């Protein structure tokens, strides 16, 4: 069973994914190649969200499905993969059509801001980028394109695991 987690920045996507990694899943990333390009070609040393967003979007201008095609190919070769960076409607839809379990994690602005402040010294840069399409489009993913919708918070892991246990039995 392959799982894709969608949500805004600081919503807890990586926390959910890491929980699955502890249970034997392998984490892969739609943005992994973007980060690799940013490090190799732009000497990015610490997370530069605007740079990553620009690289990702420019590649999507060349071929809109570039990142999702890469992940679908991995999913055809491996099972028990988890992705924690689904951001776009087409990504969620294509992954679900390919048999992936798609989970959307919602977060309120106040909690999102608190988490960014606690995570990044330059949290304002991240907060100011919340109007980027990679942040806004995730909330346009239709309910029919997700298998499970969760609210960010202490119960999210337990709710996710209960759902996945039910699916696997």
Q: Would you name each region that the model predicts?
A:
Residues 8:
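P-loop (Walker A) phosphate-binding loop of NTP-binding proteins
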Residues 13:
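Conserved lysine of the Walker
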Residues 16:
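Hydrophobic positions on the alpha1 helix immediately C-terminal to the Walker A/P-loop
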Residues 66, 105-169:
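Small-molecule kinase domains that catalyze NTP-dependent phosphoryl transfer to phosphate-bearing small molecules
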Residues 19:
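Active-site signature of alpha/beta-hydrolase-fold catalytic machinery across serine-
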Residues 26, 72-119:
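ATP-dependent NMP and nucleoside kinases share a basic, alpha-helical "lid"
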Residues 26-80, 87-90:
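ATP-dependent small-molecule kinase phosphotransfer cores
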């Amino acid at each position: 069973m392959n799982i894709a987690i969608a949500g805004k920045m600081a919503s807890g996507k990586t926390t959910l994914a890491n929980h699955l990694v502890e249970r034997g899943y392998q984490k892969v990333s739609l943005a992994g190649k973007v980060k690799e390009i940013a490090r190799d070609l732009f000497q990015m040393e610490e997370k530069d969200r605007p740079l990553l967003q620009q690289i990702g979007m420019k590649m999507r201008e060349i071929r809109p499905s570039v990142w999702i095609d890469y992940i679908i190919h991995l999913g055809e070769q491996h099972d028990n993969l988890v992705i924690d960076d689904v951001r776009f409607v087409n990504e969620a839809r294509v992954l679900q059509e390919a048999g992936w379990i798609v989970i959307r994690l919602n977060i309120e602005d106040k909690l999102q801001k608190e988490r960014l402040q606690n995570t990044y010294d330059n949290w304002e840069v991240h907060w100011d980028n919340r109007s980027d399409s990679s942040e806004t489009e995730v909330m346009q993913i239709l309910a029919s394109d997700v298998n499970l919708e969760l609210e960010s918070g202490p119960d999210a892991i337990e709710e996710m695991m209960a759902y996945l246990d039910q699916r696997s039995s």
